[in-house]
Regions:
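A short, surface-exposed alpha-helical micro-motif characterized by mixed small hydrophobic
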Residues: 13-15
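Catalytic metal- and UDP-sugar-binding loop of GT-A-like glycosyltransferases, i.e.
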Residues: 23
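Charged, flexible cofactor/metal-binding loops and thiol motifs
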Residues: 34-138
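H-loop/switch region of ABC-family ATPase nucleotide-binding domains
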Residues: 7-8
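Short, glycine/charged-rich "phosphate-handling" switch motifs in NTP-dependent
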Residues: 19, 31
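Long, low-complexity, intrinsically disordered segments
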Residues: 140-145
Length: 145
């Protein structure tokens, strides 16, 4: 049995899905097995979505990634990478002029980004730690309740 569940809340999706597809303006930015999407989040948009997972403690520092810039119209998508107008890791002309390639990691994750995979891994190592911490904090809160 399969079903389509659409949400910006990747934490909820983690309980429901074995495979996650992250879309931006209707285009696939990242997809793969759920655990691969989370550990670490490779695409900058996935990283931003995961950073927005609320913490049970309202006083805790969240480290949210704020996406700046205007959200483009899906009817008039920007050239190049659809996420380039809001990407916190914007590289310049290559992002504006060229569609990003799809790259596949050893664990089956597919990412559309101009940043080379080895650099994405390096950039995301801190994100992965933050996401694991955030998710384990929420899981421990649920157990305590």
């Amino acid at each position: 049995v399969s079903y389509l569940f659409i949400s910006h809340d990747l934490e909820v999706i983690s309980y429901l899905a074995d495979w996650i597809v992250v879309l931006y303006l209707g285009e696939i930015m990242e997809q793969g097995p759920t655990e691969s999407v989370y550990e670490p989040p490779m695409h900058p948009y996935t990283e931003a979505l995961l950073s927005a997972i609320p913490l049970p403690d309202p006083q805790a520092k969240t480290g949210d990634i704020r996406l700046e810039g205007d959200v483009p119209s899906p009817r008039n998508k920007p050239s190049g990478c659809p996420f380039h107008t809001r990407c916190p890791r914007f590289l310049g002309d290559i992002c504006v002029d060229e569609e990003p390639p799809t790259r596949t990691t050893d664990n089956g994750l597919q990412i559309r980004c101009h940043i080379p995979l080895d650099e994405l891994v390096e950039l995301q190592s801190d994100s992965a730690t933050a996401v694991r911490s955030r998710l384990s904090d929420e899981s421990s809160q649920e157990v305590q309740e």
